A protein has these predicted regions:
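N-terminal pre-catalytic "stem/leader" segment of glycosyltransferase-like enzymes
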Residues: 1-54, 282-288
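Active-site donor-nucleotide binding/catalytic segment of nucleotide-sugar enzymes
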Residues: 5-11, 76, 95-157
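Catalytic donor nucleotide-activated moiety binding site of glycosyltransferases and closely related
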Residues: 36-42, 48-49, 144-171
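Short acidic-hydrophobic, aromatic-tinged amphipathic segments that line or gate anion-handling sites
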Residues: 53-60, 168-172, 225-235
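Extended catalytic core of nucleotide-activated donor transferases of GT-like folds
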Residues: 54-93
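Donor nucleotide-activated moiety binding/catalytic core segment of transferases
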Residues: 160-200, 205, 209-213
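Catalytic binding pocket for nucleotide-activated donors in carbohydrate/polymer assembly enzymes
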Residues: 194-253
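C-terminal alpha-helical cap of glycosyltransferases
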Residues: 255-288
């Protein structure tokens, strides 16, 4: 029996699901879980920059039963799962957990809660993805601002020189955690990254991307994180400065307590100890 974690990902998606999945994998490290992601690059990123020990790319969540064994356990973070697929996976697994239902979305890795000192006044992070180059066009023609931009993992390679025209520097995506920790005021287009900044004791400012819907925006209101607006980068940065000058009191985010989940997992391992899954079990969802 093994523990698996699945996080939706692709080059068109942010890595918010993967960051939550990595947080869960690290918190449950004693069970040697494997983090599966929707694309192979995300699996590599999780291992190289999110401290995940075991990761692998899986084309689709529906293909997991071809890798897992019957009666394994699964935690998944995938908003695209249908009730039918959830039911199929529930029948396949000894225990099935869904992020957003069994676990909250505002799970932040414990490393962000450690004592931290900000070294940079301001920082900007849009997202890991910009497939349609919406943010690049948003920045086009702006003046150069006195703030660094953290590069996205899925940004096109040829965009760095363009961003250097708008920001004081472009920080490599491998420096993600250090950048988030060190930026006292972070202008950010990702909800989960705002929560990580908040956990550090820093002051995130959220801005809504216009190319697609952001996930879990309700958490911005829950933690009273301020928003900045602008029709282009210059207007956005001007509003960012106004927010900094009158930054409001935010709600404190707490580290999630995984103790109950760990107890459940231990109990399931003990319950199924020594059992061998039937070899004739047929899982057909992936082929439907």
């Amino acid at each position: 029996m093994n523990l698996w974690i699945y996080a939706k990902s692709s080059h068109r998606d942010s890595l918010e699901n993967v960051r939550r999945g990595s947080t869960i994998a690290n918190a449950l490290a004693e069970f040697s879980p494997t983090l599966c992601t929707g694309d192979y690059r995300a699996a590599s990123i999780a291992k190289e920059t999110m401290d995940v020990k075991n990761s692998m790319g899986v084309d689709a969540m529906g293909n997991l039963p071809h890798t897992m064994q019957r009666l394994d356990m699964l935690v998944y973070d995938n908003e695209d799962v249908t009730p039918e697929m959830h039911q199929e996976m529930s029948e396949f697994c000894a225990k099935l957990y869904s992020v957003g239902k069994d676990l909250p979305f505002d799970i932040v890795d414990e490393s962000y809660f450690k004592e931290n000192k900000s070294h940079t006044k301001k920082g900007v992070f849009f997202s890991d993805d910009d497939y349609d180059k919406w943010f690049l066009n948003f920045c086009n023609g702006s003046k150069k601002h006195d703030a660094p931009l953290l590069n996205g993992n899925y940004f096109f390679l040829d965009t760095t020189k363009e961003y250097e025209k708008s920001f004081s520097e472009v920080t490599d995506e491998e420096e993600y955690k250090a950048f988030i920790k060190s930026s006292e005021y972070l202008l950010c287009g990702c909800v989960h990254t705002c929560l990580e900044s908040l956990a550090c004791g820093n002051k995130p400012v959220f801005f809504m991307r216009k190319d697609k819907l952001s996930s879990n925006v309700k958490l911005i209101s829950k933690y009273k994180i301020p928003l900045a607006y602008g029709k282009n980068l210059d207007a956005l940065m001007q509003d960012f400065e106004k927010v900094i000058a009158n930054y409001p009191q935010t709600e404190k985010i707490q580290a999630y307590d995984f103790s109950s989940l760990k107890e459940e997992i231990v109990a399931v391992f003990k319950e199924y100890e020594g059992l061998v899954p039937a070899m004739d079990y047929s899982y057909s969802y992936a082929n439907k």
